[in-house]
Amino acid sequence: MTDRLSQLIQAVEEADSSKLLLEAVQNLAAARLEGAIPILIEALSYNNPGAAVASVDGLILLGSAAVPPLLELLDMHNYTARAWAIRALAGIGDPRGLVTLLGVATADFAMSVRRAAVKGLGTMKWHWFPDELREIAQEEALDALLFVAQQDEEWVVRYASVVGLQSLAIAIAEAHPTWLAEIQTQFNLMSCNDEVLAIRGRVCVAQQKLQQKIQQLKSDSFHKSIEIKETEEKKSPLTSNDWQDILNQLYEIKRQERINSGSEGDPRRFQQLAAAITETNN
């Protein structure tokens, strides 16, 4: 542990007022030191919302290194800390948080947590996914976001679904035009039928952004720049075991869907995916 990190942690531990605690956590978060992750996660449990917000911001800055301990925190019974952890996972966009965000976005009782998860589904780091797994993951995200847009009673969560759908639409526009059309149809319905003016306005912005994306896809120069960008971005810190875990979680979702719908599905699809992922990572 460096002297600087030790001093920053000591300031958090010795803070004797809400104000000093907030300042200490903010300073620790701003340092962007991986050694601070355990203390930042501990701060999510403090009875200090400002410190929790600062911790979430710091964990997001630290990115994927913070994901394993955040996922461990989800197994604990402190709902307040769990809610803040979900906000951090949503902001990081690491694929290991995907299945958690899918469940939270559609079922958590706290609207602020659902809202964070919904936005996180749209901004997932899709370029990290192996080609064999990206399609099924994006399909699950699309289903969850459409469900929220159509069913959630809280307008702030539906508003977030527009943001999430916009981000997802931009990510899948070229590879999945059918899905893009589904999103555009949902936007058209919301722009006409949603009773909240703010949502209709945000839908209008999303439609404009999508139109710009569609125009860009028609540009040869844009295609070349995207190819370069994807080559640079596709490096992922996840291991083959991480991807296998994600695949297993998605398979379980599909299995439950088959049980509920009475459909047999095709488990061979997942067997082929598992084989492809193993081969890709060897």
Curated annotation (Swiss-Prot):
Entry keywords, A to Z: Antenna complex, Lyase, Phycobilisome
GO molecular function: lyase activity; oxidoreductase activity
InterPro entries: ARM-like, ARM-type_fold
Record-level GO cellular component terms: phycobilisome
Listed EC numbers: 4.-.-.-
Known role: Required for the chromophorylation of the CpcA gene product.
Quaternary data: CpcE and CpcF associate to form a lyase.
Family: Belongs to the CpcE/RpcE/PecE family.
PANTHER family recorded: DEOXYHYPUSINE HYDROXYLASE, PBS LYASE HEAT-LIKE PROTEIN
Record protein name field: Phycocyanobilin lyase subunit beta
Source organism: Pseudanabaena tenuis (strain PCC 7409)
